[in-house]
Amino acid sequence: MNLWHATSPTIWQGRNDLAEADNALRLFQTVKLSPYFTPEEFSHYVALLGFECDEGVKRNQGRPGANQGPDYLRQSLANMASHKGHDKLVDLGSIRANPNQLSEAQQALSDAVTQCQCQNVRTLVLGGGHETAFAHGVGIYDAFPHQRVGIINFDAHLDLRRSPQPTSGTPFRQLAEYCQQHQRLFHYTCIGASLASNTQALVDEANRLNATIIWDNQCRETMLDKVQQQIQDILQQVDLIYMTIDLDVLPAYQMPAVSAPAALGLPLERLLQLIQPICQSGKLQAADLVELNPLFDIQGIGGRAAARLAWQLAHWWY
């Protein structure tokens, strides 16, 4: 497959505790590592797919480095304990973008996602900048042409920018246009957005598209019940969910390893409270974690936070 490569076995390394007990397992021992892109061999698994691309971040005037995110996240995951759901993970490698060829890389990821989904393999994509979302979303729409797809984006930014070329700030505007072209419902919710980080033009665009915005300061602990009810309402309106988590939705002290660290953000514990019902709804078909930039991590804090999110997501998914 174009631009695809297998993950090196050296990425999945960790502490071996099997001398203690047969079930003293870690992810590096239970994640299946495929040398070929063969989703047909892993029906009812969750595929880890890397998207080694930050071309969209560069175009959006961000800090490059997210192309190194997928393997960094894999390494952070490798030594975590393996529990329920983690034995259903298979690493199906990564798409590696060539310089200045964003559209080609996005097409390759879309094709890979569609192939997985058509083989009953759910997709957990590791970005990469948030340009990942356009490719992942198109892959889902193409795999499920007759289903109502809901997009839930946990993100400090609405990512509905107007731009002469695709960037990490345009994916949901692109998906809205894709839906219009294909006569599909565009059902978009952004949770954790910062009003301080989104211009009025972006808010107006969200309103034009009938998007739902739940601002970061509406996700305080005392307001979680209301947010949870909003999430339940969203789940009732669609057949399946594509959930995308831009790691800059976390506060900077928990996630320094992004292009645009958040001054406020949603703390990791609160974010987990919000994603749990989505993961356990039976409607989550695809998810990704994007914008992880190892070049700006501090003592591995960001890598571990991202890994805990991915670990928890997989644990709740099955």
UniProtKB/Swiss-Prot annotation:
Record: residues binding Mn(2+) 1: 130, 155, 159, 246
GO molecular function: agmatinase activity; formimidoylglutamase activity; manganese ion binding
Annotated catalysed reactions: N-formimidoyl-L-glutamate + H2O = formamide + L-glutamate
Positions with a binding annotation for Mn(2+) 2: 155, 157, 246, 248
Keyword Phosphoprotein: no
Listed EC numbers: 3.5.3.8
Cofactor binding comment, as recorded: Binds 2 manganese ions per subunit.
Enzyme class: hydrolase
Keywords, comma-separated and alphabetical: Histidine metabolism, Hydrolase, Manganese, Metal-binding
GO BP: any one term: L-histidine catabolic process to glutamate and formate
Superkingdom, natural source: Bacteria
Cofactor(s) in the UniProt record: Mn(2+)
Pathway assigned in UniProt: Amino-acid degradation; L-histidine degradation into L-glutamate; L-glutamate from N-formimidoyl-L-glutamate (hydrolase route): step 1/1
The keyword rRNA-binding is assigned to this record: no
InterPro entries recorded: HutG, Ureohydrolase, Ureohydrolase_dom_sf, Ureohydrolase_Mn_BS
Coiled coil: none
PANTHER family: ARGINASE/AGMATINASE, FORMIMIDOYLGLUTAMASE
Family: Belongs to the arginase family.
Primary role: Catalyzes the conversion of N-formimidoyl-L-glutamate to L-glutamate and formamide.
Protein name as it appears in the record: Formimidoylglutamase
Native source organism of the sequence: Photorhabdus laumondii subsp. laumondii (strain DSM 15139 / CIP 105565 / TT01) (Photorhabdus luminescens subsp. laumondii)
Lineage summary: Bacteria, Pseudomonadati, Pseudomonadota, Gammaproteobacteria, Enterobacterales
